[in-house]
Amino acid sequence: MNLLTTKIDLDAIAHNTRVLKQMAGPAKLMAVVKANAYNHGVEKVAPVIAAHGADAFGVATLAEAMQLRDIGISQEVLCWIWTPEQDFRAAIDRNIDLAVISPAHAKALIDTDAEHIRVSIKIDSGLHRSGVDEQEWEGVFSALAAAPHIEVTGMFTHLACADEPENPETDRQIIAFRRALALARKHGLECPVNHVCNSPAFLTRSDLHMEMVRPGLAFYGLEPVAGREHGLKPAMTWEAKVSVVKQIEAGQGTSYGLTWRAEDRGFVAVVPAGYADGMPRHAQGKFSVTIDGVDYPQVGRVCMDQFVISLGDNPHGVEAGAKAVIFGENGHDATDFAERLDTINYEVVCRPTGRTVRAYV
């Protein structure tokens, strides 16, 4: 029996996909499944998303794109992080769309002797991370337009402040993106399918849906903007089996450095999840776990393999083997856990690693 598990609810994934498909309306729905489907397991999750309405998939790396083809995904797949030095020809041969994120990437594709290459141009509209810069637009557009083996399917960009719906930076980026799109079309690139909406923009700015939307986090049932609810169902639960319960005397400490000491005689329990499994060491004293509907605070330093919780005088009789929910079903949700750790729910669902075993329900 596994001591540490992430339970993935595939029915929740299916439900979320249907909700997002309906919200997308006439726009195509691209599912972002990078980072092993946000740590939910792409081999199980992607087929469910495909079966319930996704028109396309987006990933970061070539390996992720190839994996989608290996598991039978037939929809369009867009890969946006690759280098000209990589063997990207194999991806082209498997009908994977490649992002043009710089003039060097454009040149590498233009110089490739493939018969047909589908590309999408990524525009840097203000995030200043990756994407073709404004001073490079004209040169890249004209070069791609002159390459007969290149099919430019569209353009996309990434929004810096979409999780702040009132931030004017989003509209400034959209103005820049539309300027790039107009220039591309002036150079003869039709760019029929364009997209700017990640999860927060998709859920809060229907005026920006364009021809396709590109949510990621929302597929896994998490809300990207605080205070906004869209009927999504969280798919991940991170839980562990209590390994031992022991008595502790008043004044005694626990874990390295004895940074926490019991005020009264009582009990502590050990939960086998440590920083080797994705539980951050700096989480000391910031969160609680839920056992049979009761919250118990984490105390002392988080160790490599385990952390400690205080049971008080253990009125509910917690014993070894009890299920401790770190976040998810019957416990605090991932967003609450993230807030306690001063981070975001995107990171939290990517944390369970190490000896955590994924189980599907």
From Swiss-Prot:
TM region(s), chain numbering: none
A GO biological-process term: peptidoglycan biosynthetic process
Superkingdom, taxonomy of origin: Bacteria
One Pfam family this sequence matches: Ala_racemase_C
Catalytic reaction annotation: L-alanine = D-alanine
CDD domains, alphabetized: PLPDE_III_AR
Organism whose genome encodes this protein: Corynebacterium glutamicum (strain R)
Enzyme Commission identifier(s): 5.1.1.1
Name of the encoding gene: alr
One term of GO molecular function: pyridoxal phosphate binding
Binding sites annotated in the UniProt record for substrate: 129, 304
Protein name as it appears in the record: Alanine racemase
Cofactor(s) essential for the protein: pyridoxal 5'-phosphate
InterPro entries on file: Ala_racemase (IPR000821), Ala_racemase/Decarboxylase_C (IPR009006), Ala_racemase_C (IPR011079), Ala_racemase_N (IPR001608), PLP-binding_barrel (IPR029066)
Residues the record marks as active site: 34, 256
